[in-house]
Structure formats: structure tokens, C-alpha cells
Amino acid sequence: MKAIINGKVITVTGQTYDKATVLIENGKIKAVGPDIPVPQDAEVIDATGCWVTPGLIDCHTHICNFSEPGTMPGLSDGNEMSGPIQAQIRALDAVYPDDYAIVPVREAGFTTVYSTPGSGNVIGGTGISIKLRGHTAREMAIAGSEQMKFAFGENPKRNYGNRKQMPMTRMGIAGILRETLFEAKNYSDALKAAETDPSKAPKPDFKLNALVPVVRGEMRCRMHAHRSDDILTAISIAEEFGLDYVIEHCTEGFKIKDFLNEKHVKCVVGPHLTSPSKLEIHNRTMDNPGILSKEPNITVCLTADTGSQTSVLPMTIGFFIRRGLSFEDAIKGVTINAAKVLQLEDRIGSLEPGKDADVAVFDGNPFDSMSLCRLVMIDGEVYKNTL
């Protein structure tokens, strides 16, 4: 048993305590509060003067599949660009547990990240949520957390337009995605019909089979879209096929905030500390997270997107706060909102009894560039402690 005592405890979903205890047993949070008795045999961690938060979550990264340094071709496994539809491939099969990014990101207070395929394809395959611990992909992965990657805009256009093959345009992206989802829906319907009449079973198709849970609404889609028109196209297609979706990046979301609010959109906003390398991100602004978070029906998460850059996401969030994002919405963006997007809110994202003992301790406000993460705990095991 472990007890983190005397810290300012930010539960996220409940009360913030100026001085409280987090009690941990068997990898789970047992109790949180100011008057928690500490057993005599507990390992005591004194967090006096520090802020205690849930382990942080970046729910859109390429950690472990675009491993670093990215200049080495042998470490780049995030885009299978041999064809625009790659629903059957899995980021899990490219998770590299010795990726350079793991240690700096973990030491910045992050305990869970979502590792997604890149956006070079219209359908890029499934991503996976991973804990930043373990020695194999299977140890790191959270079973059942797969979600399907779709991409709109410049990346698929550039990758396939240069080859003079579809999709060369935004029309082509929407068209090939609709066509594939149409085929997947028919395939899914045939599978259902075959449950009572085996003669109606479709010819096995590995790619379409991977999309069956998507068109049945059983697997969430992560829809890469920067420009406002691409965001609207993504939502239109999601509604046409009854998909459960999240908008990734949502760079021009501020332009259509009322529409996004009406649709109760979940979005993952970022990155911001990169060069404006594409026309579709030239309207990027650090006001965007604050603008979107003020809308009551929009769920906002915050991302650094890449690999080790996630280690400076807390500092970046400090810039968002300066531009209008509240602290409450900021901490939710890398804890409980991110957990909800990953559909893991029953396990991570807040300090509550019964949840995984993923904890970060900072020597000040986590989003102050002068603060340091002093302790990181994942499933009750300490991976960093400089208290």
C-alpha cells in the first residue's frame, strides 16, 4: 500500500483539496480525501507543497509507431501508404516499446497515450491506447481500446495525388470513403443475414471485416480534419453512416463553433508548436481551445500530436490559458475528457476510488513552464520520484 500525503489534490471530476491523501492499494486508488487514515505499513510519499493530479493523457500521438529519431526510415511505421484504404492494419503491430519518446513523455507526467496511425491514407487502420510502461507491446496496450483512423484534407491528397491516383482531390477522399463504408455496410448486413441463413454469407473480405464494428457503431472513428470544410465533410459522412466519431485537430473549429456545439462534437485540438507546414493549418490559433471549451456541448481534448513533443504539452497548455482557456477545462483536456474520447473513463482520467493508480505530482501548477513533474505512478508503481 502507498499513501501520497499533504499535497494539493486535483481529483478533476470531484473536489479539489488543498491538503489531502491519495491511498493506493494493488494498483488501484483506494481512497482520496483530507481525512484518510494512513495504515502504519503503508509506503508514505510526502507531497507537501505539490499538486497531485491524475496521470496525464495525450489521446492523439504517434509514440511507439513513428519512433524517434524520425530521420531513420527503419523507425517510421505509422503510415502504410501502399493504398488509401488500410482498415485492416493495426498500430499495435508497430508499437516499439523502446521508443525514445516514452521516457521524456512519462517524466512530464503522462501515463497513458493513444498511438494512432498517420493521416497519409483515407482509412489508416486502428490505433491503440497504451500505458507508458512495460517491455512488450502487449504489456503496454490496453486491450479493447482500438479506434479507426480516417483522414481528410491535404495529407491523403498529397500522398496519392503525386502518384496520379485516387484520391487526388477532396472530392476523391469523400468519394472513396463513402464507397468503402457503403461496401462495409452491405458486408455487415450480409453477415447478419448469414446468422440465420448461412447461404447469405458474403465472400470473406479482410478489409471490410475490419470495418464491420465501425459501421455498426461499435468502434469509434478518429477523423483527421483541420479545415472547417473538411470538418463538415467528416461530420456529414459520420451522420450518413451512423458512425461514432471524434474530430482530430479541429484546427478551424472556432469558425464553426455553433455547429459543432449543436452536434455535441468531441474534438482533439492540436498540435500548436509546429511550423505551419501545410496551407490547411495557416489559420491555426492558440485561441481555439478556449473558444471551443466555452461551448457547453463540445468536448475538448488537447494534444501535441507527435512523439516526444508531448513532454512540452503542459507548457503549451499554459499558452492556451493565457489566451482564454480556463484551468478547469485545461486539466480536463489532458485527463477526463481524453479518457472519455478513449472510452476509458471508467479506468483513468481522474482520482477516484476504484480507478487505476495513475498519478502525477508537480511542484507547482502543471501548466506553469517553471513547474516540474516530480513523481509519476502507473498502476501503483513509481516510475519517477524526485520529491
Go through each PLM region and give its residues.
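Active-site core of metal-dependent hydrolases
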Residues: 74, 91, 188-285, 301, ...
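C-terminal cap of metal-dependent C-N hydrolases
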Residues: 5-11, 340, 352-387
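Metal-associated gating/positioning segment near the N- to mid-region
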Residues: 50-117, 128
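His/Asp/Glu-enriched, well-ordered alpha-helical/loop segment
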Residues: 68-69, 75-82, 86-88, 220, ...
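Metal-coordinating catalytic core of metallo-dependent amide/deamination hydrolases
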Residues: 129-236, 240, 274, 306-307
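Histidine-rich, glycine-flanked metal-binding segment
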Residues: 9-53
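Active-site gating loops and adjacent loop-to-helix segments of metal-dependent hydrolytic enzymes
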Residues: 69-95, 136, 151-159, 201, ...
